[in-house]
């Protein structure tokens, strides 16, 4: 558990991911740091793991590819990052192997998050991921996407606890590395029993739990219920990672003070802000927090993302780059007009020209 010496009242999320709200009373360097307990240890079935960084990057479908992970690593070299979600059935058929086979190319710890409704397929996928170098296996029991939940995967397992526990037991019995679970408070408020579900996961063999503070019914609406996460934390003996509405170092300190969690996982807040994990990590250690990149640095980062995606994905890279550029190009004068132009640019050359013209107005350097 990371214990903060003083809890602070909760504030609304920042309008720009990874950036404090305007009017924030003090820079992060002056906030009371937590009592740093050292690396987080996760028990495996013969192969334990240690996390030097207690800030985890969530798997993000269509986002957390190797290019994105490399950017996060620039600010957080020791953090546990994840591949995009991997469908166990697709992996079995050979369609998702690229996400797993590229693990060896990453410089730091990489977890593989699996989803499916078949225990045997999940166990076999876990074996493949372990053989490819996965740091740990995470089981997705929280994805709210309807087509996944309807087939019994992701948050659909919240409606079938018996199957959920069979999957955990099967995966835990198939690998030596730690098996963790990412889940939500429940399917809906009226039926949610997060403490009971979490205890069952622990008993089935989960060695850590990441808990998003919303139900599947909520999706990403409303506020994450950190108090509910705290109740689950008090009931467990395995580590608990808090997730939901952590978009700044200040949010992370408040979340840990309220929940008593062993760490935090950030997800959507890093879209366009790959520096967020590193800034939170510094805050939790009581170290000076790296500044948020300025406009010129953001534009240089956007240009770097564009070239990396074009090199990796060819013509399709431009389509993928648009969303990343849209997230990155925020928080400075003229950003809205630039984003509009980037979404309409039909060629790499036109996109490069827009970024270059914008950078000329600010001056740019690599963040």
Residue ranges of model-derived segments:
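Active-site beta-loop-alpha junctions enriched in small/polar residues
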Residues: 60-62, 86-88, 115-117, 142-144, ...
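Flexible, glycine- and charge-enriched loops at secondary-structure boundaries
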Residues: 157-161, 222, 295
